[in-house]
């Protein structure tokens, strides 16, 4: 939300100033692009596409998508041509974003990068684990991910069988142990904090200290859970 507030509609991405870089990018052998703040402006919510294109110079194998978009679309004042245009842009961006998310998370893992999504709209609860197990059953999780959780092909097959309910409960408990859910559960943000985080609008209004802290709490917890679920191979054994 804070990043989106920095780049209003119609503006190009902001290039990170040289003084914030640890080394000169022109000296790097693979000539990477200088980092840019792309969440906002003409590239709002479109960043994940470039990162997952095989021939893109931005391509990467592990992608964590922090989605703090919080725009609401209302029919109020749609007779105003400016508001109507803004609502049209917002609706288009929301559809593109959700299509990308559905393709990256809820379709077959074959020939795809590893994605972990952190949307502001998702609640901090065990539903994240239930969603992961559903993705397992539907064949949307990379084998190196479920193998890292010590889940077997037989257990995934059982999720589709006659005893699927029992298998689901067993797998949920196994995943909980694998990601150390007991530790994460103690750090779940309060409902009041979640409500404050979701009430922050994506505009040029300055955020209060409480709003910033609420956004950080929600994003930090959700990121830790999603990375433990979908990118366990990036973590050390002692989490």
Residue ranges of predicted features:
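Active-site gating loop/helix substructures
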Residues: 1-54, 76, 228
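An amphipathic, hydrophobic-aromatic interaction surface with interspersed Lys/Arg
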Residues: 75-84
């Amino acid at each position: 939300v804070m990043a989106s507030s920095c780049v209003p509609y119609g503006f190009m991405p902001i290039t990170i100033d040289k003084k914030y870089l640890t080394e000169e990018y022109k000296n790097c052998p693979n000539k990477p692009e200088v980092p840019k703040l792309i969440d906002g402006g003409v590239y709002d919510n479109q960043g994940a596409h470039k990162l997952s294109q095989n021939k893109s110079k931005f391509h990467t194998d592990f992608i964590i998508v922090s989605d703090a978009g919080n725009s609401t679309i209302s029919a109020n004042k749609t007779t105003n041509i400016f508001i109507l245009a803004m609502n049209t842009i917002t609706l288009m961006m929301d559809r593109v974003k959700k299509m990308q998310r559905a393709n990256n998370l809820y379709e077959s893992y074959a020939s795809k990068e590893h994605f972990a999504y952190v949307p502001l709209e998702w609640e901090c609860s065990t539903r994240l684990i239930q969603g992961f197990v559903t993705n397992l059953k539907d064949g949307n999780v990379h084998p190196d991910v479920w193998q890292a959780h010590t889940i077997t092909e037989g257990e995934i097959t059982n999720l589709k069988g006659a005893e699927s309910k029992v298998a689901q409960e067993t797998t949920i408990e196994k995943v909980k142990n694998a990601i150390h859910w007991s530790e994460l559960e103690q750090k779940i943000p309060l409902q009041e904090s979640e409500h404050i985080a979701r009430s922050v609008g994506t505009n040029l209004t300055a955020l209060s200290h409480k709003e910033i802290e609420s956004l950080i709490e929600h994003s930090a917890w959700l990121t830790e859970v999603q990375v433990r679920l979908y990118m366990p191979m990036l973590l050390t054994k002692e989490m």
